[in-house]
């Protein structure tokens, strides 16, 4: 079970709203979000309702302003609790529909370019666990939540291009 609290003002001030499960529309409860406290679980927060728009991965901890989660503004409109998994396994393909060279990953990778000479991934298959895909190396840039399932094209995970820099397993160990 997870727990996340959203605050309208920086430094955990102002009106707040607490969640313990997925919420597709936070707009009725908060006009803006400038700080977040994650008491338990791993969460993905989204700038738009219905889990759309830019997304940001949050682990247990305090985020006193939106820049701490690399947000560009004070808009948080939906959130999703990421289920914990014991093991993680992911297959990446250089072409759409699982074609081309394939690599399998079971650990975090800070640079796909350095480790595998890949900087574009056109399809992938999450076999176990949840992952966060980052557009840039060293866990930077746009973030995308990957849950178990098939992603035949980069549009399937919400990306606008096939650029992939790094991958991180969702593990709540902190």
Swiss-Prot record:
InterPro entries reported in the protein's UniProt record: Beta/Gamma-Crystallin, Beta/gamma_crystallin, G_crystallin-like
Homology family: Belongs to the beta/gamma-crystallin family.
Keywords associated with the record: Eye lens protein, Repeat
Region (Connecting peptide) residue spans: 84-87
Protein name (record): Gamma-crystallin D
Record's comment describing the protein's domains: Has a two-domain beta-structure, folded into four very similar Greek key motifs.
GO terms classed as biological process: lens development in camera-type eye; visual perception
GO molecular function: structural constituent of eye lens
UniProt keyword Lipid biosynthesis, yes or no: no
Segments forming domain Beta/gamma crystallin 'Greek key': 2-40, 41-83, 88-128, 129-171
Function in brief: Crystallins are the dominant structural components of the vertebrate eye lens.
Keyword Repeat: yes
């Amino acid at each position: 079970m997870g727990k996340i609290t959203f605050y309208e003002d920086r430094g955990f001030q102002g009106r707040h709203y607490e969640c313990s499960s997925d919420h597709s529309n936070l707009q009725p409860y908060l006009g803006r979000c400038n700080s977040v406290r994650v008491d338990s679980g791993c969460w993905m927060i989204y700038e738009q309702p219905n889990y759309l728009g830019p997304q940001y991965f949050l682990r247990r901890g305090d985020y006193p302003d939106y820049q701490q989660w690399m947000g560009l503004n004070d808009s948080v409109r939906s959130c999703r609790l990421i289920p914990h998994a014991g093991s993680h396994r992911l297959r990446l393909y250089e072409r759409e529909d699982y074609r081309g060279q394939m690599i399998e990953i079971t650990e975090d990778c800070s640079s796909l370019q350095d480790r595998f000479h890949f900087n574009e991934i056109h399809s992938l298959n999450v076999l176990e666990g949840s992952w966060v895909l980052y557009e840039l190396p060293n866990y930077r840039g746009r973030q995308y939540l990957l849950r178990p399932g098939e992603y035949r094209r980069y549009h399937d995970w919400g990306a606008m291009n096939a650029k992939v820099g790094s991958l991180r397993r969702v593990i709540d160990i902190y």
